[in-house]
Amino acid sequence: MDLKTKMMISIIVPCLNEEEVLPLFYQALEALLPDLETEIEYVFVDDGSSDGTLELLKAYREQNPAVHYISFSRNFGKEAALYAGLQYATGDLVVVMDADLQDPPSMLFEMKNVLDKNVDLDCVGTRRTSREGEPFFRSFSAVLFYRLMQKISPVALPSGVRDFRMMRRSVVDAILSLTESNRFSKGLFAWVGFKTYYLDYPNVERQAGKTSWSFRQLFFYSIEGIINFSDFPLIIAFVAGLLSCFLSLLMTFFVVVRTLILGNPTSGWTSLMAVILFLGGIQLLTIGIFGKYISKIYLETKKRPLYLIKEKSDLPDFTEKNKVKRL
């Protein structure tokens, strides 16, 4: 397929308080995209921003009919924003990228070129080869998370993988068919399969503004990823319970034998309290793990929508073909 073949490319951009960096992002894309010689559609998703992000999106919409925006009634999270963007995107190729310019717009050319030259490919993803500019502990934690996921999850999650990718319509339709409320897009992209080629690039620092992701949020997001794509925590709970039971039986046997042979029972409140606290800690750990999985089931049974729209540009409702209905 030639690069000049006319097709629609939808670019989905989740936004949360991106007032400072959004003009730089939009200008960078507008300067590059005409060279693609293809029809472009922007789908900006305002995830309940409290700054001037929505006003900027409205201004871009007035200037450019290719710009569409969706504004949530509150902050529902990046996963909901990605899902909404995928639902409303109409392109033959769909791009997901962040507005902070850490996803280099110039890579769109290479992505499309790879797909055009390899008709058997369904998706071009991206991976960061370095994390320069990030705090050491945050970078170390990210590397540890990916290594852990590769060990405990049946789904292959490449180290450093980003949400930044270009997908064919077939991949998007497959992702939209997954209707769970608790979403972890990196895992979902991998779970649906399809042939994916990864482009590597070094870390790019945020160009303006501040990230909305704190370390605490990233930590709990990683927990969501582990819970959603692995039963390993349940195995840990089972093994911990089995081990504590074995140790308790062993200690009981030791106390009984010592009493029968030496004639004096083992004394000492310190050792007794240590054992009680240890077993209590194991119990609380396992209850917490079970509770986390049960809470996931509870949230799914509510069948609440992933997001609510406060306002949007004159985007048509997503077509019946792509509309996901809950059973």
Where does each model-flagged region fall?
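Structured catalytic core of nucleotide-sugar glycosyltransferases
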Residues: 1-133
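Amphipathic alpha-helical segments that mediate coupling or scaffolding at interfaces
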Residues: 14, 32, 60, 72, ...
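Residue-level signature of catalytic and energy-coupling elements of molecular machines
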Residues: 29, 85, 100, 148, ...
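Generic structural signal for secondary-structure transition and capping sites
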Residues: 31-34, 94, 120, 153, ...
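Acceptor/aglycone-binding surface of glycosyltransferases and processive sugar-polymer synthases
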Residues: 66, 72-74, 78-88, 105-188, ...
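Hydrophobic helical membrane-anchoring modules
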Residues: 2-8, 131, 184-327
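Short conserved micro-motifs on helix faces and helix-strand junctions that flank
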Residues: 14, 72-74, 119, 165, ...
